[in-house]
Amino acid sequence: MLQPARTKFRKQHKGRNTGIATRGAKVSFGEFGLKAIGRGRLTSRQIEAARRAMTRHIKRGGRIWIRVFPDKPVSQKPAEVRMGKGKGNPEYYVAEIQPGKMLYEMDGVDESLAREAFRLAAAKLPMQTTFVIRHLGS
């Protein structure tokens, strides 16, 4: 599962996920991409589940790039613990996703196979996505 090797601080503020993605919004590595239309958080488990679904479908052909990385820690307090006594411990890591962000890219397979693989991956994700094709010259 993806998570930072080490961080400067263990805990982060919750923050607000606003705006649209301008960086990481184009197909840069492969021929096809899965782009987020909705906004939300992707956990490292969701990223891995979608990657497995795609990898299983394309079998041995093609190459997949993961364009997002979960670098934000989410803390939780244990069950049945009274309020107060400080912030809970980091339990998992998430990637904050804005609309327009490229999530995955794929190359070395034909379009119909890529579409189906991304459809299977999108079912594992908590936000709306769309299939995009890299246009030559961009």
Swiss-Prot record:
GO BP of this protein: translation
Pfam families in UniProt: Ribosomal_L16
Membrane-spanning intervals of the chain: none
SUPFAM superfamilies for the chain: Ribosomal protein L16p/L10e
CDD domains: Ribosomal_L16_L10e
Self-association state and partner proteins as the record states: Part of the 50S ribosomal subunit.
Similarity section: Belongs to the universal ribosomal protein uL16 family.
PANTHER family cross-referenced by the UniProt entry: 50S/60S RIBOSOMAL PROTEIN L16, LARGE RIBOSOMAL SUBUNIT PROTEIN UL16M
Protein name: Large ribosomal subunit protein uL16
Gene expressing this chain: rplP
